[in-house]
């Protein structure tokens, strides 16, 4: 499979993917047309049940070991014959990853879970000092409704399973998302110090954010990803955007992705916890409890955290039928008059939502482009 990506002078590359007979990604060759067609090759090897045994990017090689429950036990990164990093992993009786110890740096990252096996706290210990870097709270449906990163609190409010808007520790609304009918976040408003900034998401075919564009057409931030979603953000990122790889919520403080049912570690290509969905008997690749998208992250995404979903060709952002556009943002992005617009307005109320110190009712607007 071959894909080509081109974004002015920023990205101009071609990727060629190779798979084994089980459909698992085993090689990616990237040709950078900006640098005299220089190529970079990354290869992956797996065991019979789908555990990644080795990743080789031409510069470093990372090897992995597992226990009998397919739980990751060690990862060793080598450059030539020199060992650069060794990590050791531990799990609790429920199959939740609880500790990641870097034996070279002495840093230990600890995960704590609630009674429903949901990640509730992440802390880091180094040189005998422990710091809590993240705390999470969930509602009865299992959705994360609050995240505390250091001294910054974010409260999440959902529409049909997708984050519609957020508030800060004082209940002040600081964002409002524009959501498509397929649950795709198309644009967003950010409220900061009595000012409003509008942003439009540019996304690739996987639904991953490639750039966040301001009203003047300039990019607030650009995003690049490895095959399994390791994320590099360049730019100011004034919007503090979290919607990144395949539309998942990226927690920069932990390096993890919140994919609703579970948290995903793109560096290892695995989830931290077992999947409560045990897969289908006639589809063995769905029965692994930890691996991401059956080791085929190019053609599949996992928005629920429960299993791979095939990518629909042609599912890119555009003025197509059925997209949801908020009135204010639609006008700001000069969509008025582009298509016949039918307004379908719904109202609903949430508790203590405030903007600029004033309590207000949340109004959910849905505008369908026909």
Name each region found by the language model.
Residues 1-18, 24-37, 41-56, 61-65, ...:
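Beta-strand elements of repeat-based all-beta scaffolds
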Residues 48, 54, 58, 62-64, ...:
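A motif-centric feature for acidic-aromatic and gly/ser/thr-rich catalytic loops and repeats
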Residues 277, 301-310:
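Polybasic, low-complexity binding patches
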Residues 13, 38-40, 60, 85, ...:
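Exposed loop/turn and edge beta-strand positions of beta-sandwich/beta-sheet ligand-binding modules
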Residues 9, 32-35, 60-61, 78-81, ...:
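A short acidic/small-residue loop/turn micro-motif
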Residues 93, 115, 140, 205, ...:
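A cytosolic small-molecule/anion-sensing beta-strand core signal
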Residues 306-370:
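Hydrophobic, gly/ala-rich membrane-insertion helices/peptides used by toxins and envelope proteins
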């Amino acid at each position: 499979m071959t894909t080509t990506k081109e974004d002015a002078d920023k990205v101009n590359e071609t990727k060629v993917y190779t798979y084994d007979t089980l459909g698992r990604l085993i090689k990616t060759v990237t040709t950078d047309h900006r640098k005299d067609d220089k190529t970079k090759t990354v290869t992956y090897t797996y065991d019979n049940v789908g555990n990644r045994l080795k990743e080789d990017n031409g510069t470093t090689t990372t090897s992995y070991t597992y226990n009998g429950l397919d739980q990751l036990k060690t990862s060793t990164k080598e450059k030539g014959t020199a060992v650069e990093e060794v990590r050791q992993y531990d799990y609790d009786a429920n199959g939740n990853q609880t500790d990641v110890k870097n034996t070279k740096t002495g840093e230990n990252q600890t995960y704590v879970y609630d009674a429903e096996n949901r990640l509730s706290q992440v802390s880091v210990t180094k040189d005998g000092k422990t710091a809590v870097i993240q705390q999470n709270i969930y509602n009865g449906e299992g959705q994360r409704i609050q995240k505390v990163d250091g001294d910054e609190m974010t409260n999440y409010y959902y529409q049909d399973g997708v984050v519609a808007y957020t508030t800060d520790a004082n209940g002040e609304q600081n964002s409002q998302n524009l959501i498509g009918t397929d649950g795709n976040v198309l644009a967003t408003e950010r409220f900061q110090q009595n000012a409003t900034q509008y942003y439009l998401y540019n996304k690739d075919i996987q639904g991953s954010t490639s750039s966040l564009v301001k009203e003047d057409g300039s990019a607030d931030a650009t995003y690049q990803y490895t095959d399994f979603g390791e994320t590099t953000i360049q730019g100011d990122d004034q919007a503090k955007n979290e919607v990144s790889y395949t539309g998942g919520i990226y927690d920069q403080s932990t390096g993890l992705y919140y994919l609703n049912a579970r948290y995903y570690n793109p560096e290892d290509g695995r989830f931290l916890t077992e999947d409560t969905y045990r897969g289908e008997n006639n589809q063995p690749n769905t029965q692994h409890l930890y691996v991401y998208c059956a080791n085929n992250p190019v053609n599949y995404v996992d928005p629920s955290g429960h299993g791979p979903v095939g990518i629909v060709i042609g599912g890119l952002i555009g003025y197509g039928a059925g997209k949801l556009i908020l009135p204010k943002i639609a006008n700001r992005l000069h969509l008025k008059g582009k298509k016949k617009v039918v307004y379908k307005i719904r109202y609903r109320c949430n508790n203590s939502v405030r903007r600029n110190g004033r309590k207000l009712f949340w109004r959910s607007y849905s505008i369908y482009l026909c």
